[in-house]
Amino acid sequence: MGKDSSDVTLVKNSDNIVATWSVDGLTFTQTVTLANTKSALHGMASISYGVKSTDGRSADSVQARVMLDTALGYQDYAVYELTKKDSTYEQIQSETVIDNSDGEAYNNALFGYDNPKAPSVTAYTVNASINNKIVAPYQIAFGHWNNLASSVFDFEPDNSLTFTNPYNEKYLTADSAYALYFDMGSVAANGEGDT
């Protein structure tokens, strides 16, 4: 991670799981909460992040990458559909990075499904709002799990790699993941931020 980092600590509460770790004077907190434990629609979770300066120094630009591994039943990959601001969809099956720094490439939701011709399993990602402000990533990376997981933050896609192809030459497996990149802004000395 950084020059000065800690191991991740986990705390399981009655309604969430909290992971905490530190890097270079910043303490990060990830909270995963089931969205509605009484719902028949199991598996909907809320993921939030917080950062706090713990060494008396400020941080000008804190960014976070959230990598999510997609498994749909026994299938370890998804065909992704990115919702766009103009109400169209972009199907993604090859490694790519989408620049959303202007907020125009992504309309706060994406989904993946097992079969583009006859979907039977679907997974969704919807960005929430904090204090009436939509929290959207400035960048989204889609890739083969092996390639995306081997990068810590920056990701160089192999645009010729189709991650839904079990016979791709690089990994000989179909496997996908995606990463959402968030700008958490600046953090004042001993201050906090969240996403």
Spell out what each predicted region is.
Residues D86-P137:
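Active-site/ligand-binding surface loops and adjacent short beta/alpha elements
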Residues L26-T31:
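Amphipathic hydrophobic-ligand
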Residues N16, S22-D24, A40-S46, S58, ...:
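Beta-strand-rich recognition/accessory modules
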Residues M1-T9:
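Acidic-aromatic substrate-binding/catalytic surfaces of carbohydrate-active enzymes
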Residues A40-N108:
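Acidic (Asp/Glu-rich), glycine- and aromatic
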Residues V32-L34, V51:
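Hydrophobic beta-strand positions in extracellular immunoglobulin-like domains
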